[in-house]
Regions:
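C-terminal polymerase-core module
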Residues: 171-175, 217-319
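A generic structural motif
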Residues: 206-215
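Common nucleic-acid-contacting/processivity interface regions adjacent to the catalytic cores
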Residues: 2-108, 167-182, 213, 317-318
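Short, structured coil/loop segments at alpha-helix boundaries
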Residues: 4, 8-30, 40, 131-138, ...
Length: 319
């Protein structure tokens, strides 16, 4: 079946893919260009495979809404959720106050090295930690978000969708989630300060992430600290992820990218603070490819438009 603009837009929202140009041939060109960094082709093929199981797109959207509504109702009708809504949230106050709360994406942190600890799927993880039976689907109490949504549908694209999780849990008193998430991360910080690092290293603290700057340490010492942090994180009662990365400022614009060092010695690139207009030009610079007419095309006030000039993009030499 031919895929509509509405369905393409939903696909990009579901997968958190920064594409806002849905006309062909530009949409497919963007999917191919972004594949190395976002895994877009696999996700698109899965979306098409699932979409083709329906008689028409409207049937798919109705299934999507049915899953969303059923999952939301299941959470809200649970006794655990109702108890959570009656909690005195002052009980979940944090002990570490006045920590830096502005993100690290600023020029003064260019070429600085960091270790981050973040809560995976924070809204789900926090509520699941509070009470596992809040996430009971027709198939029983779920251990993961995917298991929970999988209790309402067999559509793998919907099961993997980040957007539907945000919509569902965004309808379940999110301010309380954030308070509880922050309380949990405060507890994580307490345990890490006891064994891994001093509080002066913390350059960012939020409800779902802690970031440490380690640029002043030799590489060996950085890796030793990473190992200590990772070992502590594994012992926590809920799912956390550690990242070890070098932050780069992209010359010619306000964007950044994280060069993430993986355990196998490889690196991954994650772009930050880039809008959907500039991202194609940055991708071409990373891939060392020529900018195409499609890269210069964008959608503006109901019309296709094109950049007259090509932005200057300067990236550090990549390993």
């Amino acid at each position: 079946m031919e895929v509509s603009t509405r369905a393409k837009e939903r696909f990009c929202k579901d997968c958190n893919i920064p594409i806002r140009l849905f006309q062909e041939p530009y949409f497919m060109e963007r999917l191919k260009l972004y594949d190395r960094f976002y895994g877009t082709i696999r996700k698109w093929n899965l979306f098409l495979e699932e979409l083709n199981k329906y008689h028409c797109e409207q049937d798919y959207f109705e299934e999507y809404n049915r899953v969303k509504d059923a999952a939301t109702m299941g959470i809200k009708e649970s006794k655990s959720y109702q108890r959570f809504n009656k909690e005195d949230m002052n009980y979940f106050a944090v002990s570490h106050k006045n920590l830096p709360g502005k993100d690290i994406f600023k020029a003064s942190f260019d070429r600085k090295t960091f270790i981050s600890i973040d809560m995976k799927k924070a809204n789900f993880t926090a509520l699941h930690h509070y009470a596992t039976d809040m996430f009971q689907s027709p198939k029983g109490i779920a251990d993961t978000w995917e298991d929970f949504i999988g209790g309402f549908t067999e559509n793998r694209h919907i099961i993997e969708s980040k957007y539907i999780r945000q919509v569902i849990l965004g309808n379940c008193n999110p301010k309380r989630h954030i308070t509880y998430e922050r309380y949990l991360m405060d507890g994580v910080l307490t345990k890490l300060l006891d064994k891994c690092f001093s509080i002066e290293r913390v350059v960012f603290f939020s409800n779902d992430e802690i970031v440490l700057e380690v640029s002043d340490l030799e590489v060996g010492a950085q890796k030793e600290m990473l190992k200590r942090v990772a070992n502590c994180v594994k012992k926590m009662e809920f799912s956390l992820r550690t990242e070890y990365f070098l932050l780069h400022k992209i010359g010619g614009m306000d964007g950044y990218y994280k060069e993430i060092y993986m355990e196998d010695g490889q690196t991954e690139i994650e772009f930050k603070c880039l809008d959907n207009y500039m991202l194609p030009f940055v991708m071409r610079a990373f891939l060392e490819e020529e900018v195409t007419e499609g890269d210069r095309t964008f959608y503006h006030e109901g019309l296709l438009a094109r950049f007259v000039e090509i932005p200057r993009v300067v990236v550090d030499e990549k390993k």
